[in-house]
């Protein structure tokens, strides 16, 4: 077994900075990989709201007030501080510059410049920080897409690019030309395309999404490039932190419960109803949703179908909405006003309320237009909250349709992105809820599902092995079946497909235990 040095580069990492599911991946996967014997570290921007915590909470500030690295990047000075991811032993590098000072992660007129600067700083750091030099830089989404393009000139550093959401592709080439120097052979349209083109290996966060993005419907204009990537594009399903998301010990619940004793869910449901002004009734079908108010999450479909469903049933609905579009927020508020005592809307991400929704609601709604993976449905099932989802992306890989006559399935699914199909699915779930024994069996099947990060981490190690040509797994498990891939078209061979040197000489052989 060999120990590799792997640097995760991302815009978010839970629990320090979180907007979407990428933060959960970056905050959880390195912890598991370190347990499997790898030297994994994280690098991310030092946002203004993190500065405010320095000196207040142990583990959330640099070990030294002086930067460990300071150099010119894109004509500006970048400083890097060393810290540790709170609650773990994962080393954390924080890139400091005044452009990250505002108390935000995304948006703003300088968003493209900020993350291009961050990507350049990561590349320079990997090249020049001699106390620790990574063998692989694991990049996440468009914010780090330029790193594989720059690092391809370094044959001793491999790159992995993970696509969390193909819809967000970053600055286009003409914008990049104004911000930074580009090599003459750069041929990607934007930073997302650059990451896909130049990375040694590319993966998405679910097998189904890896197949979907090779088609015009989901490819966002990059389907030909993704199809050309062939076997170097794969889907690895995300996991969840099963220690953090454990209904037996979760401190944010009114009452804890387990797969063997679900009685605590009734107390959580009553607390949730009372807290949000809903009619307290244990026999009412209570649906929950935790999502950003954007089209991707199916908010337009939700407005069409749920408004009528609440009119014609005794069901209740709770929505915890994060950042999103003002239009959808206005429509949701109007719905809540039309259904007093039956619908509640809370704005902004509230972790404690989210946990109470998972632990108290009967069903969890995810009518997504597209969903690269989705974390919420896995958390919901772990808490006995039955998911109602549209079959797309990672929802296909994690939720199976309930067939009462056969006693199989973990949730309710519909295919077409149409209000009638969603309404019908809601009605079927509501009807099944009336049969308590059947519903409880459905809950327990979901709770028994294995969504731990361990299996996913082994898949990532297999992918790293393909880059390093060295064994990283403690024991060689059987290889998974080959995932479907498209044959590369006959194109001029770009520099991104040139073979690398065999192995990394700096790696040290670890003694077998």
From Swiss-Prot:
The top EC class, named as a word, is transferase
What InterPro entries would the database entry show? Glyco_trans_1, GS/SS, Starch_synth_cat_dom
Q: Which GO BP terms, alphabetically?
A: glycogen biosynthetic process
Q: Does the keyword Transmembrane apply?
A: no
Q: In which pathway does it act?
A: Glycan biosynthesis; glycogen biosynthesis
User: What are the alphabetically sorted keywords of the record?
Assistant: Glycogen biosynthesis, Glycosyltransferase, Transferase
Q: What is this protein called?
A: Glycogen synthase 2
Binding-site positions, ADP-alpha-D-glucose: 18
